[in-house]
């Protein structure tokens, strides 16, 4: 906690092995809670060396653990202190040095930017997305967490795979998403922890948009990777039906990660990565009885990573 820059200062002082050990332990907990695929972002290094360190750890985690992992370069997360008086120089570093190196080493699948008042402007976000596209790294964007500044419209224009947060939405934002290929993603456990407004799930779904759900697991605003909590918050706070919430955190989240062909539904030809619950009276009981552990078994690629009574 303590903000992005505080977390970045701590991460810079950690070795790659320390970072790997801590991240591996968190992912093992998440797998036991039913997560079979995860996107891991950098963004807490804010230097070439530390951002690369984070992404190299992600590659180690991919090799060590069975769950599907996507890596995202989020160097445009906050302005580091050493560039406090020269924003353009930091953007130059990201676009001209960091993105090419990340691509050359095969360290990331996407680029991301925190496009928000007091962080990065729409024009700066567009610059990062353009640099990513030039190196075949599709964009994802943190946007509309606190204010609506036109980031969604620009993200859609640049073909971003997803726009994430969306606690503050205006009609123009919904208009931009309607008919696009960009997936809107809400992060209700972030709203819960920060005590900020929840995203307008029903407004988004009323536009027939494929709403996705995720945790936003990070040290400053969501110190939890538990998707079971997200399911309960989606139904209790976002007013989603259980079927809608489960669809959002499976099929639509897979689409937001670019994994629709592999994951998101129990379908012939896809990976056998799924959970089997303990006996429950109905689907609605899963979000209703919040805080309880309803999972019996977790399978990833057909192999139990948490074996219960049925395995």
Where are these regions (language model features)?
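Active-site metal-coordination/substrate-binding segment of hydrolases
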Residues: 1
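Metal-coordinating catalytic core of metallo-dependent amide/deamination hydrolases
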Residues: 4-24, 28, 36-150
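Non-catalytic positions within long, well-ordered alpha-helices that form the structural scaffold/packing
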Residues: 31, 95, 103-104, 133, ...
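Loop/turn positions that initiate beta-strands
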Residues: 269-272
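Active-site-adjacent C-terminal substructures of enzyme catalytic domains
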Residues: 138, 148-265, 277-279, 283, ...
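Short aromatic-centered micro-motifs
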Residues: 298
